[in-house]
């Protein structure tokens, strides 16, 4: 499982990007966030996730927020 930092996330549109520890940007969709309630991420938030190859490049799945 990779770790990274939320680069930006638009809660209204439900997507954004996560910067990995090696500097790669990975697409993040709200449906991949593993939490109850409103699924959103905050800029600068630390997260853990798996990476899958999506239609438009690397995509984060199984996103969990780190304390």
From Swiss-Prot:
Molecular function (Gene Ontology), one example: DNA binding
Annotated ranges, domain CSD: 4-63
A family per Pfam = CSD
Chief localization class? cytoplasm
Annotated coiled-coil segments of the chain:
none
Give the induction annotation.
Answer: In response to low temperature.
Record's keyword terms, sorted: Activator, Cytoplasm, DNA-binding, Stress response, Transcription, Transcription regulation
| CDD domains, sorted | CSP_CDS
Output the superkingdom of the source species.
Bacteria
Q: Listed GO cellular component terms?
A: cytoplasm
Q: Where in the cell is it found?
A: Cytoplasm
Query: InterPro entries, per this entry?
Result: Cold_shock_CspA, Cold_shock_domain, CSD, CSD_CS, CSP_DNA-bd, NA-bd_OB-fold
Subunit field text: Homodimer.
Please state what the protein is called. Answer: Major cold shock protein
Task: Tell me the organism.
Answer: Streptococcus pyogenes serotype M1
Q: Which gene encodes it?
A: cspA
């Amino acid at each position: 499982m990779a770790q990274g930092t939320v680069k930006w996330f638009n809660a209204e549109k439900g997507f954004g990007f996560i910067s990995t520890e090696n500097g790669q940007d990975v697409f993040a969709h709200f449906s991949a966030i593993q939490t109850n309630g409103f699924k959103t991420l905050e800029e600068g938030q630390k997260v853990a996730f798996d990476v899958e190859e999506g239609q438009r490049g690397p995509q984060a799945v199984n996103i969990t927020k780190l304390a």
